[in-house]
């Protein structure tokens, strides 16, 4: 079909503008994919653990309450409590605990004074004065070892992609 001797259609510039606008609309309108199958479970759990430890350190100082991060090494569950929680609140915290993915497990938790604990329940305390128990949390994902160093007075958690120990 022609109009005044020209072929009807869109120019390349018009098509590029329309595609760019559609791309921008999709970028801002689609929700972020939380359960992306391409994300590595060990990285997701590592970020969760690091974030949880940093949050508890900050909360202990801000709220002036002692917090405790509990690990059940046999079931791979992690939960938090604080000193002002009732028994019912503590039971709810255990029921709503974070469960590690099946392919990721906590091997042990190492303390400088107590040594390595590799079964049962282990607790790391976060005190209202701003310090915490010094500990190394060791995880294993297949043949990959991950270590998280929690320092008493340093807010950030150190992460190692190896099995680190206080004896090293």
Q: Which stretches of residues belong to each language-model region?
A:
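N-terminal helix-rich module
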Residues: 2-3, 28, 34-47, 58, ...
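Hydrophobic alpha-helical segments, principally membrane-spanning helices and signal/leader peptides
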Residues: 14-16, 49, 113
